[in-house]
Amino acid sequence: MYIRKKILFIFILLFSFTVFTQDIEEIIVKGEYREKSIIEEDSSILIIQSDKIKSQAIKHFQQLSYLVPNLNYAASDSRARYFQIRGIGERSGYQGTPNSSVGFLIDDIDYSGQGGIATLFDVDQVEVFRGPQGSRTGANALAGLIYIKTKDPTDKFEGTSELTFGDYGTQNIGVAFGGPLNNEKMKYRLVMRTDYADGFRKNIYLNKSDTSKKDELTLRYKLDWEIDETTNINFLVSKVDMDDPADIWTIDGSLNTLSDRPGMDSQITDSIGIKIKKNFNNFDLQSLTSSTKTDVVFSYDADWGNSDSHFPYTYDYFSETLRKRDTFSQEIRFLSKNKDFSQSNPLEWVFGFDFSELDESNLTKDDGVYGDPSDPFGPYVSESSISRNYKSENLSLFGNIDYFLTNKTKLAFGLRLENWDSKYKDSNNESFSPSDNMSGGKISLVKKTNNDSNIYFSIARGYKQGGFNLGLDATDNLVRQSLIYDPEYLTNYEFGISLSLIHI
C-alpha cells in the first residue's frame, strides 16, 4: 500500500511520508483526466494497489476503508452505500434529493450513493482523493472522491482464481481470465465472482441461521478494440447482484434475533460503459458514455421481535422501501499532447463538457399493529405508503491548464461550471423544481524536489447541489419555494509535502 498523506496547514505544519523503496516501479494516478505520476499530484491522495488488497483478504470496499485515514462509511444491515471523507458525507438516503458528498467511480462510471456494489475481486488499484474535487468531478465530490480501477484486458492470455471456505458457511469463488482474441487488435477480460456467508446471527424464533446472510454475485466483461493506430474503443458491461437479508437488530444485544418478519437489504446494478479514444496530431479526444440501472430493496422488522417475545402485548411493525435508479452520463474531453520543452511547449490542457441525468423512484410502505390487553379500544392498526419520483439533469463545462514553469515546477488552474435542474413529486402532493448554477475549481503550485518527493500548495473549491425539505405537506407555491435550500460550497486550503522513503 502506498500512502501519500497531505498536510493541512493552519497554524502548525504536520509532516507525513509516502513510503516505498527506490527500486519500485512508478506509481500512477489513474483517476485524473490524464494518468500521471503520484509525485505530480497536488492533493491529498491514498492509493492501494492490487497486491495489498490480496494480502488483506479483502472482499469489499467497506473492509478496505479501515486502511484509509479520514474515511468512514455508513451502513444499515448490509453493505455500506454511503461514505464520509474528513467527516463530510451522507449517512442514509431515505428521502429528498439523492445528492452525494463523496463521489464513487468504478472504471469512470459514477456509482455515487450506490457503494454497496464495490466488490474488490480483480481490482487493479483504489484511489481515495481527500478534499473537494469540484473541477474534476463536480457536484458529487464536495468532500472527496473514491476511484476504483479494475484490471484491463492484457496483451497475453492470463488468468487468476480464488477459492475460500470458512466458518459460518463462508464460500468465496472467483475466476478472471482474458487476453487477445483471434484478431490481435481485440482483447478481453471476463470476471465471475460469488461470495456467500450465513452471517454471525441466528434467528431463534424462526430457527434459521441465514437471515443475515451475504449472497453476492459479480460479473464483468471488458473488451478493448484497437481499430487503428489512432483509435481505440473500450467496452464494459457489468452486473452486481447482492441478495443480503437484513436481520441483525436484537432486543437484548446478543447475536440471537427474534424477528418474525426478517427484512432485506439487497441491490442489483447493471452497468454499461463505452470509452472512445481518438488521437489527432495536436490533441486527443475522449468520449466516455455510461448507463446504470439499479434496483434496491430495503426492509426491516421494526419491532425486532414476535408475538411470543412481546406477549401479552400486540406489537408488530414492518417497513419496506423499493427503489429504482437509472443514470446516464456522457462526457467529452479534449486533451493536449504532453508538454515538450524542446518545442517550447510548457502547457498541458484539457477541456470538455459533461451531461448526466438521474431518474429515481421510491415506494415506501409501513404497516403495524399495537395492542394493550388493558386497553378496551385496541388493537390499533396503522398502514401507510408513499411513492416518490425524482429526476435531475446536470450539464457542466470544465477545463484544466498545467503550466510548467520549469521541468520540476508546475502551476495548475482548474474550473468547472455546472447547471442543475431537478423535479420532485410524491403521492402526498408535494412537488419541487429546484435548479441552480454552481462553480468549483482549483489552483495549485507543485514543485518536485527530486524524483520521489514534492512540495505543493493548493486552493480548491467544491460544491454540492441543493434540495428541499419534505414532510410539511406544502401545496402552496410560495410555501414550497421557502422550503428549497441552496447549494453547499467547501473551500479547502492545503499545503503538502510528499517524501518517499521505504516500502511497506
Each predicted region: which residue ranges?
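Extracytoplasmic beta-strand/coil segments of soluble accessory domains associated
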Residues: 62, 66-107
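Short acidic/polar hinge/loop motifs at secondary-structure boundaries
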Residues: 93-94, 101-132
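Structural signature of Gram-negative outer-membrane beta-barrels, strongest in the C-terminal barrel
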Residues: 224-230, 238, 334-337, 346-348, ...
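Transmembrane beta-barrel wall of Gram-negative outer-membrane proteins
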Residues: 158-160, 165-197, 201-244, 268-270, ...
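N-terminal periplasmic "start-of-domain" segments of outer-membrane beta-barrel proteins
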Residues: 26-54, 81-84, 102
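Surface-exposed extracellular loop regions of Gram-negative outer-membrane beta-barrel proteins
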Residues: 183-202, 216-218, 247, 284-327, ...
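N-terminal periplasmic accessory domains that precede
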Residues: 27, 62-64, 82-84, 128, ...
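Flexible loop and strand-edge segments within Gram-negative outer membrane beta-barrel domains
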Residues: 232, 236-269, 309, 314-315, ...
